[in-house]
From Swiss-Prot:
Zn(2+) binds at residues 16, 18, 36, 39. PANTHER family: 50S RIBOSOMAL PROTEIN L31, CHLOROPLASTIC (PTHR33280), LARGE RIBOSOMAL SUBUNIT PROTEIN BL31C (PTHR33280:SF1). Binds the 23S rRNA. NCBIfam families: L31 (TIGR00105), PRK00019.1 (NF000612), PRK00528.1 (NF001809). Keywords: Metal-binding, Ribonucleoprotein, Ribosomal protein, RNA-binding, rRNA-binding, Zinc. This is Large ribosomal subunit protein bL31. It comes from Campylobacter jejuni subsp. doylei (strain ATCC BAA-1458 / RM4099 / 269.97). It comes from the Bacteria. Binds 1 zinc ion per subunit. Part of the 50S ribosomal subunit. Belongs to the bacterial ribosomal protein bL31 family. Type A subfamily.
Length: 65
């Protein structure tokens, strides 16, 4: 590998929207993410239920169907 052409590899602080922070290595010093393993439904085991039935009823009521 040639010297002096690669970006510097530094410690990186990753901050999530949920408030979780952790350290890793990257060529950037700081990263901000929306979802991490602390709040992602796959890792937490929780499901986000969408109330589609309620939305349909609201639509039908609004347009008198």
């Amino acid at each position: 590998m040639k010297k002096e052409i690669h970006p510097e590899y530094v410690e990186c602080k990753v901050s999530c929207a949920c408030g979780n922070t952790f350290a890793t290595k990257s060529n950037k010093a700081e990263l901000r993410v929306d979802i991490c393993s602390n709040c992602h439904p796959f890792f937490t085991g929780s499901e986000k239920i969408v109330d589609a039935a309620g939305r349909v009823e609201k639509f039908k009521k609004k347009y008198a169907m």
